[in-house]
């Protein structure tokens, strides 16, 4: 990503201690080099990585995906560039993006999978059962749920009719965990629910699985075919421009078809748990949200607390604003999103480290 000839400095004890104790990101590395600029310099070998670090609003992986698409559009629309120069720049951008993607995989393996226990740990019942109430099957007999407010009057009456007329076996709840995470962390939720016989459970790792290099590689790229510039990119008739669009990776296995089969099969409620609903998944989320069988969208938001444990803000509004971008029909969006008074913060689980 970048190179620095700092070897001439680290022989100095003071510089060596400074490097070890205070340099832990790119900004502190730049500061270190400025203090010893007579001896060393910094040169980037990956311009995409440089742009990531120069952006002050890159906080999530979706921001990196958005930045990739932005740079792809800049190259595509630059009238001063000849066609061959555009192709060359896109080839370089794709190679640099691949480097960042490989670093993402390495980070997740080293800092998550190899470091934390992702399995259910005996004796940690309080932690692992925080999600039980959230993932309980919908039931008109559950007085804690305000189903008549989370659904339209018509849908609620239909729910009541179903519970009155269907047998216990046919009235089982269905849970489809659409996992956008690359690790197995989300599987903890399903393992807890394995104790619940009234819930039929399925896991769909729609963005791939870390370590699976065959049928289900991680799908890190961009997925907004609704963007007004996508048709321009598509019409260039060069597959290099489409290399990192998620739709083509979805077709490498059956996960996407399994999702479509499910949403076509019956009415459903969407629970948003930890997903920012950013534009990089716009095509997929539009398919889910605007589908006629999607009857309700319930957001579990994140709270930020001060040092005294008092909530100072949450991201409910930010999430529903992001959700709105996936709707062509805004009236439909307002009808489906469950209002904040009926939603709740997403439980936070502290994973234990491996020993």
List PLM regions with ranges.
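SIR2/sirtuin-family catalytic core signature
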Residues: 1, 259-355
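Short, well-ordered alpha-helical scaffold segments within catalytic/effector domains
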Residues: 160, 183, 253-257, 282-285
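Extended, H/D-rich, highly charged conserved domains that either
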Residues: 2-251
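Generic recognition of flexible, low-complexity loop/linker segments
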Residues: 163-167, 174, 256-262, 286-287
